[in-house]
Structures are given as structure tokens and as C-alpha cells.
Amino acid sequence: MRISDIAKRARANLASVFKNPAGTYRQLKRVVRAVLGYARGMLDYPAAWFGLSRPRDELAASVAELLIVGFYGSNTRSLSARLLARQIHRGEIGGVFFVNQNIGSIKDVKKLLRLFRAGPNQPLIAVDHEGGIVQRLNKSHGFTQLPAAKRVAARMSPDEAQKLYTIAGQELAALGFNINLGPVLDFDNPENPAIGKARRSYGVDPERITAYGEAFTRGFASAGVLCAAKHFPGHGNSVTDSHHGVADISTSWTTAELEPFARLFASPHTPAMVMIGHLRHDSLSPDEQLATVSAPIVTGLLREKLGYQGAVMTGDIDMDAVSQLMSRKHAIIQALAAGNDLVMIKNLFGYDPLLPQHVVRWVREAISQGVLTDAQIKAAAARVRAIRQRIGPGQADP
């Protein structure tokens, strides 16, 4: 992103503050943080661009598989997008994810996807494409507008939903995306700010949630787009939104919220990935850690008790729920130690052009200190490579 683009966005957000001070103050504060962090990060940009002193051993290659990273801007003029593409091409980073601010015109999206896919290493390219208000590519981009999950469950059978999701998957795959960050398997609670109020849940009956979750997974997978079921172990009954702080489910969560995950894992269409929510549950995690960095939840509950064998991914660790509690370094290392395979890092607040080099160094330190093992990193990388093999070369438009 150019400095002029940052200034333009900052002015737009400043104008919105005067229209709605209470609703946009937080957004403005985030923009200021992003601008300052970007400016500081640019000091390391030349070293990152030329790959000075970048590690090239087997451990570094494994760590690269585990990183799925965001970028600034919505077109190929973005300096961070260009650097991220270069790091993907050199094998320093394994994936990229798009959020709202990365989606401009369909022409710009196509150019960005070509930029990321241009090298020898084909990245994981992820986007939220649930439907309703969580659909980054919509009718304005020539995409089928998907209803929110709650409406799908109310008006369609699972078979009808699967046909709709298949069409949506074909549209994503044709553009070049290969990962959809969905389906949502959380329970519906109308008071929940993150799930219920946005109508992102299929209901409260585990069997019904599973049926539509399977339709979602099966439809997108049939088009070559793999899915990440979320938000384990269940975000639906929280009273806060993890985008803006810790979502404590210690007193509101019930074991029934595990059932949609367990049922989908036992189906013929197990999702390739599961996303861990930035959720706190003091009984499930006696060390009072967020689920994202909790070995009892990621390894003990998800892996061992429910038997999930696919790849486990974090939500964006730069979200407030995590960043307010720990440094990026601590979050990455603890997430990997807990059993996650993919770590999502927006790299927006505190932009770090040398992120891949830093993560490799942090992992080496953690291995030397006994926090991680070389075998853990290799096993996680192997699960991510298995996902790549299922995706194939893709069908992006020229």
C-alpha cells in the first residue's frame, strides 16, 4: 500500500468518526496503529525484499508451511502484497488470506491472485465466503450472493444448500482461491454479537448444524476449495466478540456444542481444516489459556478425544483477543506448542516485513528451550502439505 492510499483511508475513517463517534472511534484507533506500525516496518523492507540472511534449511522450509499471512491494500500497488508474493515465491511463507480491506474491484482481485500464484510455490489462498454479511466476494464482483447460514437452514434442504455451495465453490476456484474459512458450526444465540446477531449459525440442533455444515464442506470441496470448520470448541454462546477482546465461554458453553464438530468429523466429508476460536474456557483449559494456545483444547480435546486428524489452524493472532494478552512471538510459539498446524497472522498492526525470518528464529529458540520439538514442526508441516496435495494446481482465470 502506498503512503497516499494510507492517508486517504485515514481521512475517510476520520470523517466517519464525526458522523458516528461512538461507533467508529475504535476503528480510527486501529487505523492509526496500522499506519504507525506500517511506517516502522518499512525500515526493514529492503532487507526483507532482498532476502538478506534468510534461513534456507529444512526447519525453515517446514516453518514456512505453517504461516498464512495477510497484507495491506486491495491492489498490486501494495508494497506489502508485493513483498508477500516474493516471500511466497521464495518458499518463506506458505499461504495468504484476504479480508475485507483486501477486496477491491474484481479486476484488482484477479491481479492480486495472479501476483501470489506467479511463482513456483503455489500458496494456500484463503477467504471468508460463508454467505450473508461474511462474504468478501459478492454480487458486485459477479459472484452468487449466498444467504446467511440461518436463512439457508430455514429455506433450503441440505441437498439444495449443497448445490448452492457447489456453485459458489466453482466461482472461488475459477478465480484462484483454494481455501474457504467456513462453515460455521457454532450454535445460534440471537444475543451473541459475533455469530447470532450476524445470522452465521445454522441453528441449535447438532444434527441440523451438521447436515448443513456437511453440505457446505461437500459443495466447496467438490469444486476444489477446501474448508475450515469453525470456531472450535464453540463460539455461539459467548457474550462478546473475539475480534475486540477475549470471549469467555466458561459459564455459557455446553458439551452439546462439540457435537456438530464430532458428527462432521465422523461423516464422509470431514473438513480439511478446523479453526480454533479465540475463546477462553477455564474448565476445558485449566491453565486459563485461550483455546488458541491451549494444548488441553487443541491436542487433548480436538485431536485425542474427538480424533480429528486434519490440519488445525488458528484464527488471526493479531486480533485483539490475542494481542491484548500476549506478544506475537508468544502467540505463535504457544499456538504451535498447543498443536496448531497453521498460524494466521494479519501482519497489520506492527507490520513486520521480516516476519518469516523472525518466526524461524523464534521456533529455533523454542526448540532449544524444550517448548517445541523438531518432530512437532515436521508433523505439522506434513499435515499442511497433505492439504496442498488435495488442492492441486487450481483453475485461476488468465
Predicted regions and their residues:
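Membrane-proximal basic amphipathic "stem/tether" segments
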Residues: 1-52
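Active-site mouth loops of central-metabolism enzymes
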Residues: 68-79, 150-159, 245-254, 318-325
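Mid-to-C-terminal alpha-helical segments outside catalytic/metal-binding sites
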Residues: 361, 367-397
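Second-shell residues forming the walls of enzyme active-site clefts
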Residues: 96, 104-121, 208-367, 371-372
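N-terminal hydrophobic targeting/anchoring segments and the immediately downstream early-domain regions
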Residues: 31-141, 343-345
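Glycine-rich, aromatic-flanked loop segments that form ligand/cofactor-binding clefts
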Residues: 117-144, 161-188, 209-233
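Short, acidic/polar
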Residues: 76-88, 164-168, 258-260, 328-332
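Glycine-rich anion/phosphate-binding loops
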Residues: 104-109, 154-167, 207-210
